Amino acid sequence: MKPTVFIQANERQQLGAKISAHSYKRNSANPDAFDVRILHTRDFPRLMDPNQSVLRGGQVRQWDPDDLQSFTPLRFYPPQAMGFEGRAVVTDPDVFALGDIGELFARDLKGKAIWAVPRPGHNNRPDYIATSVMLLDCSKLRHWQFDDYLDGLFGHRFDYFDWIDLDREDPDTIGLLEPEWNDFDRLTPRTKLLHTTKRRTQPWKTGLPVDFTLQRSWPVNLLNRMLLRYLPHPDPNQEAFIYSLLAELVDSGEVTVDEVKREMAANHVRHDSLELIERYRGWDARMALAA
């Protein structure tokens, strides 16, 4: 089986996932050497059931299949999908390749099962590891049995954060990637994978009502969803980069104008997306970043 990039997605992030998938192939010197696969929550019935709850930060919270980030359990599915063989990269749908993912697949894993970018200080943790991008040696992750994990998650046998933050893994099996392989809202000539991780400023969402859950009580979350709006991203180059990729997808027919219109009508992407496609068609990220 070829090395595979797995991109998590749900209804709210499916267009972002398509843009992400395009970026990996587009910016690789050898795009036929690996596969790209989108993992959509709708194909996993247990993730679509709202009548269940999880432990999250020590508190019981209702599971919301419609949340912006309901795909995150799928970070732990790729080894099983690969038959516990070979290498996989798993990413969130708001991660876009500027560099060549083949470089990541080709690196010496030094016996480690998991490689990811450290993010010291995030969530008040000096040892935080970002699982939004992971390079995996699937042969060393046979304990990642996805159905068993979902049993444990929805059965409150472990805390969501302990799982998603890799606290249940042996730290000796985790290697640390360079920051450019999960560049958090930073686009520079060194960036390999751009991650538009600040949900409030995702470039394709500007002006829309927020559709994600904060770590607060449900009345506060409901009020936030009613009142809060996505803000413009502070770096216009990131907006340009993402919409230039979407323009290529539209021009190739992989994404239709009608699909973009449906996503706009559903408030999954900003309502001026067609104008931005025209504005940024042909925009060259490397030239812009070198200027």
Which sequence ranges carry the predicted segments?
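Residues that flank catalytic or metal-binding motifs in active/ligand-binding sites
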Residues: 32, 75, 91, 129-132, ...
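Active-site-proximal specificity loops/subdomain of glycosyltransferases
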Residues: 33-81
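Short, acidic, metal-binding catalytic loop of nucleotide-sugar glycosyltransferases
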Residues: 23-32
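A glycosyltransferase accessory/donor-loop signature
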Residues: 1-3, 9-12, 18, 36-38, ...
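Conserved hydrophobic/aromatic beta-strand scaffold that supports enzyme active sites
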Residues: 78, 114, 131-135, 174-176, ...
